[in-house]
A protein has these predicted regions:
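Short, small-residue-biased leader/transition segments that mark boundaries at the very start
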Residues: 1-7
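Helix N-cap at the beta1-alpha1 junction of Rossmann-like dinucleotide-binding domains, i.e.
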Residues: 14-17
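Rossmann-fold cofactor-recognition segment
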Residues: 26-40
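Conserved Rossmann-fold cofactor-binding substructure of NAD(P)-dependent oxidoreductases
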Residues: 37-52, 64
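N-terminal Rossmann-like NAD(P) cofactor-binding module of classical short-chain dehydrogenase/reductase
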Residues: 54-57, 72, 79-80
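Rossmann-fold NAD(P)-binding glycine/threonine-rich loop
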Residues: 83-118
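Adenosine-phosphate binding glycine-rich loop
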Residues: 108-156
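C-terminal catalytic/substrate-binding lobe primarily of soluble NAD(P)-dependent oxidoreductases
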Residues: 140-267
Length: 267
């Protein structure tokens, strides 16, 4: 039958905790643990082959997606992730035109996966993933026509006692919030705008209430128009003024730059 391999981030691991969980499992013959460097494609492929894996579930920072995605292809494994391959802004018109979009790397290789007869389901977490399923359900069962699919995330990013405390990967937070957000319209296709644009107050249900949300780059806008018949697709996040202020300061200081810098001869 083979086995499933879940890739965890090399920068976020504790092998003792992994062993602790493993020791509590009733059927130790069904599970195993191993150290793996998620940036090392060869290492991933060797471990997948050694364990006769048939599924690779990628649960790490999307900066590692390409090599894990390619490792799954090379080893014939079904592949799933919760965030798609990264984007690159347009070199001269970043706030109006798309450069390399989220997931482009994966979609460009779709035909090769089909020909090989293996399955890849990128973006199958909550956002993206569950939100896309909800949208498809709405199209199939609730509405005759859809003007806009608007994903609204009312996340509370404040933690008492901390001035700035993202609740997931700090780098992913900086990148997705400061990258040009993507919007899709039926007559225009995909285009970009400035970060934190088009603020609106959305009244969330369940006692959450009104929260200001702004445009943020997210996979749903790249996925939904491919399968949902709508006139517009957007994603907005409830970041809050303080959180946005910190992000703008990081950008002003150049601390959002992915390029290597040299300090006293060290990169």
């Amino acid at each position: 039958v083979g086995s499933e391999m879940c890739i965890r981030d090399r920068a976020d691991y504790d092998q003792k905790r992994t062993q602790m969980v493993f020791s509590r499992l009733n059927n130790s013959n069904q599970f195993s643990t191993a150290f793996i460097d998620a940036s090392n494609q060869k290492m991933i492929e060797e471990l997948a082959a050694k364990n006769a894996c048939n599924v690779i579930m990628n649960a790490v920072d999307p900066i590692f997606n390409e090599q894990i995605f390619d490792a799954a292809f090379n080893t014939g494994c079904t592949y799933l992730d919760m965030a798609m391959t990264l984007s690159t802004p347009h070199p001269s018109k970043p706030f109006s035109e798309c450069g390399k979009k989220l997931g482009d790397y994966q979609f460009e290789r779709s035909e090769a996966w089909v020909k090989k007869g293996i399955l890849a389901i990128p973006g199958i977490g909550v956002e993206p993933g569950m939100a896309d399923v909800f949208a498809r359900y709405a199209q199939d069962h609730l509405f005759d026509e859809i003007d806009e699919v608007g994903i609204r995330d009312g996340a509370n990013l404040a933690i008492e006692g901390y001035e700035f405390a993202p609740n997931f990967s700090i780098w992913t937070t900086i990148e997705e919030c400061l990258n040009p957000p993507v919007i899709w319209e039926k007559d225009k296709g995909w285009y970009t705008t400035k970060p934190f644009s088009e603020p609106e107050v959305f009244n969330f249900p369940g006692g959450i209430g009104p929260v200001e949300v702004v445009n943020v780059e997210h996979e749903e806008v790249l996925l939904l128009p491919r399968w949902i018949k709508c006139k517009r697709a957007t994603f907005k996040y409830g970041l809050g003024d303080q959180f946005i202020g910190v992000l703008k300061t990081l950008q002003m200081l150049g601390l959002d730059n992915k390029e290597q810098i040299e300090v006293k001869g060290v990169k």
